[in-house]
């Protein structure tokens, strides 16, 4: 997979959330879950991926442009997101939303 991002946004994200986009790319190497982010009209399809990086569940907002994943933000998953992720794994009801890197 190829990744891209805005460098100023990456630096601001490290300060705000403590997660570097260079580390967030590794989420896509292991099991992860993707949900569509439809909270607003972004003018493009945005998704949020949830997965573990260094034993920490993170959320990565991104958009896919052809074969490139453009990272928009990355942060530690909140408690509600952690529960949703854990429930999906435990129940295996949503296996079509899990992807192996």
Question: Residue locations for each model-derived region?
Answer:
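Ribonuclease/tRNase effector modules and their secretory precursors
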Residues: 1-101
């Amino acid at each position: 997979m190829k990744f891209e991002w805005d460098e100023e946004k990456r630096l601001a994200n490290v300060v705000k959330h403590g997660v570097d986009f260079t580390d967030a790319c590794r989420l896509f190497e292991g099991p992860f879950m993707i949900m569509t982010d439809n909270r607003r009209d972004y003018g493009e399809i945005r998704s949020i991926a949830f997965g573990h990086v260094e034993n920490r569940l993170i959320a990565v907002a991104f958009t896919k442009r052809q074969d490139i994943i453009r990272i928009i933000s990355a942060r530690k998953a909140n408690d509600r997101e952690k529960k949703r992720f854990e429930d999906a794994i435990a129940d295996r009801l949503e296996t079509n939303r899990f992807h192996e890197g």
